[in-house]
Amino acid sequence: ENGYCLMVGASLEVAKAVEPALKALAPTPQTGWLHVGPIGSGHFTKMIHNGIEYGMMESFAEGLELLKGRKEYGIDIGKVTELWRHGSVVRSWLLDLTAEALKGDPELDEIAPFVADSGEGRWTAVEAIEQGIPAPVLTQALQVRFRSQEKSKGYGYKILSIMRNAFGGHVMKKKG
C-alpha cells in the first residue's frame, strides 16, 4: 500500500540493473529507494535506521508512560496519541500505529511488558563503540529492551511491543 523504503548497497552497474524493481516496490518511482553506495552500504544504512527507530520508539514509550503515571489527571492516552497525530511536531507513522493499537485496548491489559530485539540495535551499538561515537539514545533504547525481557512490568514496554507488532508483525506476547 505505502511501498517500501529501500536502501541499496551495490555497484552502480547492479543498482541500474535492479532499478525497475526498486521503482516498482517504492511508494513512487522517485521516492522510497536510494542507491546509498557500494556493497554492504545498504545493509549498514538499514542497521542505523533501525537503531534510530529504537530511540524514537523508546521516546514515545517513556512519554506515554509518564502521562499514564499521573493518575490524578485522568489523561486518556489513546485520545492524546490521536491528537498528536494531527499537527504535532511528534506526528509519525510510529505514533499512528500506536494510536490505532490503543483504540482496541487502551490499558494494554492483555499485553506482556516484553520487547524483543532482533539484532540490529545490538549491531548499531557495537558500531558506535567501534567508531568511538557516543550514541546514548540508541544504546539506551537497546538496554531498555534487554531490561523488559527480565522482570519489568512497565506500560512503556507494552507500548513498544504494540508498535513493533503493528509495523512489522513482530512477536507480541500476551499475558499468561
Please identify what each model-predicted range represents.
Residues 53:
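Gly/Ser/Thr-rich loops at beta-strand to alpha-helix junctions
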Residues 1-6, 11:
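Rossmann-like NAD(P)(H) cofactor-binding subdomain of soluble oxidoreductases
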